[in-house]
Amino acid sequence: MKNADRGVAAELDGSDLRVAIVQARFNAAITEQLASSCIAELEALGVLAKHIKHVTVPGALEVALALQALAEQKDHDALIALGCIIRGETYHFELVANESGAAVTRVSLEHGVPIANAILTVENEAQAWARADEKGRDAARVAVEMANLMEDLS
């Protein structure tokens, strides 16, 4: 929801964090914008460029498998899922949106690693472009906040 009241987040310091991003290439121009915004925000929050791993996969359904492989490495404090699913004329939209979202959550819970899910699910390309920049930055902030919280809780 645009302009939603998100409350006040803790101070975000990513200087000691290692973060990995999995970007779906389907709807590539949009997901490139998501990735660019996300990486810029991670660096603004103090995450060193050398501590940001960025991989790509064909589409949203492949994101979770790459996240799982990264989670199993135990080298990252947080993971980020980036993608863009635009509604078409068939049920395929619901399938991809539901299954990719559930799989990302499952990986996070099974491996105890925070995953910021910025796989956009939109009605049309205009909605995707309207959200790409902010959602990329949001994903970075969520990843840093949750990585720090998990450290505090351990």
Curated annotation (Swiss-Prot):
One Pfam match: DMRL_synthase
CDD domains tied to this protein: Lumazine_synthase-I
Pathway stated in the Swiss-Prot or TrEMBL entry: Cofactor biosynthesis; riboflavin biosynthesis; riboflavin from 2-hydroxy-3-oxobutyl phosphate and 5-amino-6-(D-ribitylamino)uracil: step 1/2
A GO term, aspect molecular function: 6,7-dimethyl-8-ribityllumazine synthase activity
Transmembrane segments: none
Keywords: Riboflavin biosynthesis, Transferase
Residues the record marks as active site: 92
Catalytic activity entry: (2S)-2-hydroxy-3-oxobutyl phosphate + 5-amino-6-(D-ribitylamino)uracil = 6,7-dimethyl-8-(1-D-ribityl)lumazine + phosphate + 2 H2O + H(+)
Biological process (GO), any one: riboflavin biosynthetic process
Binding site for (2S)-2-hydroxy-3-oxobutyl phosphate: 89-90, 131
This enzyme's EC code(s): 2.5.1.78
Cellular component terms (Gene Ontology): cytosol; riboflavin synthase complex
Entry binding sites for 5-amino-6-(D-ribitylamino)uracil: 26, 60-62, 84-86, 117
Signal peptide (from-to): none
Keyword Transit peptide found: no
HAMAP family: Lumazine_synth
Family classification: Belongs to the DMRL synthase family.
PANTHER family found in the cross-reference section: 6,7-DIMETHYL-8-RIBITYLLUMAZINE SYNTHASE, 6,7-DIMETHYL-8-RIBITYLLUMAZINE SYNTHASE DMRL SYNTHASE LUMAZINE SYNTHASE
Function: Catalyzes the formation of 6,7-dimethyl-8-ribityllumazine by condensation of 5-amino-6-(D-ribitylamino)uracil with 3,4-dihydroxy-2-butanone 4-phosphate. This is the penultimate step in the biosynthesis of riboflavin.
Protein's name according to its UniProt entry: 6,7-dimethyl-8-ribityllumazine synthase
Source organism phylogeny: Bacteria, Pseudomonadati, Pseudomonadota, Betaproteobacteria, Burkholderiales
